[in-house]
From Swiss-Prot:
Gene: LTA2
Organism: Arabidopsis thaliana (Mouse-ear cress)
Pfam family, one: E3_binding
The name this protein goes by in its record: Dihydrolipoyllysine-residue acetyltransferase component 4 of pyruvate dehydrogenase complex, chloroplastic
Region span, Disordered: 140-168, 224-245
Family according to the record: Belongs to the 2-oxoacid dehydrogenase family.
Length: 480
C-alpha cells in the first residue's frame, strides 16, 4: 500500500486506481514568490499563481483515525535521487500497518528530515522534495536549519531558580494581659455538684478542668482530698494516627543486572493505550459449554474446500448476533449506545511484534466459502502489514480463539467501543450426562464472553450464548 502527496492539502485521501493512500505536501512558505494576475478584470475573478522556487515538504500522513505519530521504517529513495510521479518514496509504520508513501510530483528527494527508525508526529515534515537539481542544496540548507532549530529547542536551559530576598522579620505582638470581666457563673456537672454538697466543698473555689472550664466530679474529689474513683478518670484519648503523604508514584523494583529495556513499537503502544482505556469500561463475564461433535463433523467435510474453523465460528457468532443485536451494540460516550447496522466480526491474529484484529464485514450475510476466502486474504495482509484502515478498525464484535493452542478456557479484554468479545477454548472430550441420566463422552468447548455491562445485561448474554450453542450443535444452517 502506498501513500502519495498533493499540493496545498493536509489530509489523507484514497486513490482507488492503485489502492494507495495519499498524503499532502505543501510548498515551503519561506520559499514562495507569488504574483497574482487578473485574467479578465471585467468578468472574471480567477487568478493565476507563479512560484519562483518549489521545495515541497513531505508530511507524515495520518494512516488511521487513532494514529498520532508514525515511524520511518525505511527510505526507498536516497537523497538526490530523481523521482517520478507515483513512485514510492518511504515506508511508514503506523499503529496498525506498514504503508508505502508515494509522491504526486516529479522532482528530486532533496533532503531526508526524519531518518530510518525515528518517529515524527502526524503532519510533521519528514523530507523535502525539490523540483529541480538546482534547488537541492537550498533544500538541504533548509533541512539543516530545521534540524538545528529542533535540537536547539531540545537543549534550551531551564531558567535559573528565582532567589527571593529574605522576608523582613515580623514583629511579634505583645503578650495580651487577661482582663477580668467580673464574677463568672460556675459551670459544673450535676454529679460534681452532688459530690461538693456531700463533702462540703465550696464549688465556687474549685478550678474546673473540663471543657470550657466545666467542673467535673474529679475536680471536686481533688479539692476534697479524696482519691478519685477509677470510673471518674477518663482515659487519655489515643494519639491520632500519623499522617503520611499519599504516594504519587509506584515504587517499582530495581532492574535486574544485565536486563535490557525494549521500547514499544507503534503497534505495541496502540495496544497498550487500548488496554488501559478498556479499564474504564464496567465489564462482566459469562461462560458456556458447547458440544462440538456436529461442528467437528461438518468441518471435516468442508475443510478440503478451503473452509476454515475461524470462518465457521465467525459465521455462527454473526448469525447469533443477528438475533441478539444488543450484544452487537456500542457505547462510546458513556451517555448513550448505538445499534450497529452491520455485524462486523473482528478476529484476533498474532503477528510478529504484536496483535491485530482483521475484520470480517457482514459476517452474518456471507457464505462460508466467501468468508473463508476473505479471511485468508485478511490474514495475509495482516502478517505483511498491508491492511487498510477499514479492514481493522470497523469491528463491532471480537472473536479470540486460543483453542488451536490447546487452551481450554481464558478471558478476553473488551476492546474499547465494542459491546462484547468472545473467547473460544479448545474442544476436548468430556463426560456428559444426558437428561435421562446416562453418561457419554462428547467433545465440548468452553466459550467465555466479556461484555460491556452498561448496555449488555446477564440475561442478554445468556440468551445470546444459548443461541450460539444451538447453531454450533446444529450447524446445518451455517452452510446455507
Amino acid at each position: 500500500m502506498a501513500v502519495s502527496s498533493s499540493s496545498f492539502l493536509s489530509t489523507a485521501s484514497l486513490t482507488n486506481s492503485k489502492s494507495n493512500i495519499s498524503f499532502a505536501s505543501s510548498v515551503s512558505p519561506s520559499l514562495r514568490s507569488v504574483v497574482f494576475r487578473s485574467t479578465t478584470p471585467a468578468t472574471s475573478h480567477r487568478r493565476s499563481m507563479t512560484v519562483r522556487s518549489k521545495i515541497r515538504e513531505i508530511f507524515m500522513p495520518a494512516l488511521s483515525s487513532t494514529m498520532t505519530e508514525g515511524k520511518i521504517v525505511s527510505w526507498i529513495k536516497t537523497e538526490g535521487e530523481k523521482l517520478a510521479k507515483g513512485e514510492s518514496v518511504v515506508v511508514v509504520e503506523s499503529d496498525k500497518a506498514d504503508m508505502d508513501v508515494e509522491t504526486f510530483y516529479d522532482g528530486y528527494l532533496a533532503a531526508i528530515v526524519v531518518g530510518e527508525g525515528e518517529t515524527a508526529p502526524v503532519g510533521a515534515a519528514i523530507g523535502l522534495l525539490a523540483e529541480t537539481e538546482a534547488e537541492i542544496e537550498e533544500a538541504k540548507s533548509k533541512a539543516a536549519s530545521k534540524s538545528s532549530s529542533s535540537v536547539a529547542e531540545a537543549v534550551v536551559p531551564s531558567p535559573p531558580p528565582v532567589t527571593s530576598s529574605p522576608a523582613p522579620a515580623i514583629a511579634q505582638p505583645a503578650p495580651v494581659t487577661a482582663v477580668s470581666d467580673g464574677p463568672r457563673k460556675t459551670v459544673a456537672t450535676p454529679y460534681a455538684k452532688k459530690l461538693a454538697k456531700q463533702h462540703k466543698v465550696d464549688i465556687e473555689s474549685v478550678a474546673g478542668t473540663g471543657p470550657f472550664g466545666r467542673i467535673t466530679a474529679s475536680d471536686v474529689e481533688t479539692a476534697a482530698g479524696i482519691a478519685p474513683s477509677k470510673s471518674s478518670i477518663a482515659p487519655p484519648p489515643p494519639p491520632p494516627p500519623p499522617v503520611t503523604a499519599k504516594a504519587t508514584t509506584t515504587n517499582l523494583p530495581p532492574l535486574l543486572p544485565d536486563s535490557s529495556i525494549v521500547p514499544f513499537t507503534a503497534m505495541q503502544s496502540a495496544v497498550s493505550k487500548n488496554m488501559i482505556e478498556s479499564l474504564s469500561v464496567p465489564t462482566f463475564r459469562v461462560g458456556y459449554p458447547v458440544n462440538t461433535d456436529a461442528l467437528d463433523a461438518l468441518y471435516e467435510k468442508v475443510k478440503p474446500k478451503g473452509v476454515t474453523m475461524t470462518a465457521l465460528l465467525a459465521k455462527a457468532a454473526g448469525m447469533a448476533l443477528a438475533q441478539h443485536p444488543v450484544v452487537n451494540a456500542s457505547c462510546k460516550d458513556g451517555k448513550s449506545f448505538s445499534y450497529n447496522s452491520s455485524i462486523n466480526i473482528a478476529v484476533a491474529v498474532a503477528i510478529n511484534g504484536g496483535l491485530i484484529t482483521p475484520v470480517l464485514q457482514d459476517a452474518d450475510k456471507l457464505d462460508l466459502y466467501l468468508l473463508s476466502q476473505k479471511w485468508k486474504e485478511l490474514v495475509g495482509k495482516a502478517r505483511s502489514k498491508q491492511l487498510q484502515p477499514h479492514e481493522y478498525n470497523s469491528g463491532t464484535f471480537t472473536l479470540s480463539n486460543l483453542g488451536m493452542f490447546g487452551v481450554d478456557r481464558f478471558d478476553a479484554i473488551l476492546p474499547p467501543g465494542q459491546g462484547a468479545i468472545m473467547a473460544v477454548g479448545a474442544s476436548k472430550p468430556t463426560v456428559v450426562a444426558d437428561k435421562d441420566g446416562f453418561f457419554s463422552v462428547k467433545n465440548t468447548m468452553l466459550v467465555n464472553v466479556t461484555a460491556d455491562h452498561r448496555i449488555v445485561y446477564g440475561a442478554d448474554l445468556a440468551a445470546f450464548l444459548q443461541t450460539f450453542a444451538k447453531i454450533i450443535e446444529n450447524p446445518d444452517s451455517l452452510t446455507l
